[in-house]
Curated annotation (Swiss-Prot):
UniProt xrefs under Gene3D superfamilies: Cyclophilin-like, Tetratricopeptide repeat domain
EC number(s) reported in the record: 5.2.1.8
Ranges for domain PPIase cyclophilin-type: 11-178
Protein name: Peptidyl-prolyl cis-trans isomerase D
CC terms in the record's Gene Ontology section: cytoplasm; intracellular membrane-bounded organelle
Reaction(s) catalysed (UniProt annotation): [protein]-peptidylproline (omega=180) = [protein]-peptidylproline (omega=0)
Amino acid sequence: MAETQRRPRVYFDIQIGSQKAGRIALELVRLPFNDVVPKTAENFRALCTGEKGVGKQRKPLSYKGSIFHRVIKQFMIQGGDFTNFNGTGGESIYGEKFPDENFELKHDRPFLLSMANSGPGTNGSQFFITTVPTPHLDGKHVVFGEVINGKSIVRKIENMPTQADKPTTDVTIVDCGELSGEDYENATKQVADATGDPYEDYPDDHQGEELNAQVCFKIASELKNFGNTAFKSGDVALGLDKYQKGLRYLNEFPDPDENDPKDLEPQMKSLRFTLHSNSSLLANKLGQYKNAQNWATYALEVADAANAKEADRAKAYYRRAVAYSGQKEEDEALKDLQEALKLAPGDAGILNEIAKVKKAIKDSEAKEKAAARKFFS
């Protein structure tokens, strides 16, 4: 098939804060033999390449350097305002606005590309990517493409902290353009990240073999190893991401069915314990003490079912104790350390932490007494 007969494919290279996040590849609905919304698709394609030069607002007609200015979880991520960066600007290659072509395509699934507008016939450059089906937008917004790769990046943006629906950290399109040749052909291929992880961040977005308990266990086991690799290389945040991703896949099928191997259930429970406990370890290192406390608690809750070894239970108690200490809850920390010591008698790390916690309690009591004396003097 000649290149001109194929649907255009374009890309966004995304940066979150100062960190590269990766590439989102999109396919546009514009075919000579299926001419659905050619004008809308051409507008987006040209704004990706920047080939139209400068617009009427004396700004480059290009998405390069613009941000995703509006993000609503379980709805969509929105960008394309390359003039004001806040949802009030942007313009099309045809002028400030152009009419709705048609509403033939529906918002019936996540990862669809659709035009943002401020009412009928007000299409400019702003667009959004759905993260769930949004049928209430049918007949109001023009769908003209879809994400074909980089869905994990869309999910990462969707789940970012926001203030008044704007990400608290800038999500920038640092480069964009049209794909051709080998890049076009490879646009749909899932590329492994630096750890070797080829899987989508969320099971709902998984493509390939059908998910079941055995497949999810296999993927979660691999993700544990990817997390270990990241942690050993010094990337604590990435390691934590992999452990949490593994739990998402395990939670997709929390219990095997009757046709699965008999040893699958205990293996799944053991893996769940490990992923929670490892998550607690890394969260402590990142100063996420409340999360670390919760994940250690989850590990201890499944310890019996997972048939966890005493040494591993001791680690979970120790990690929760560190989390309590980080939140200045020394009394709770001391209780957990004493439980850990019962399971791992004489452990130097536990004994050192007990000494630190007891000193913190003693120092706190001394401060309280000094404050009381000063108050009554």
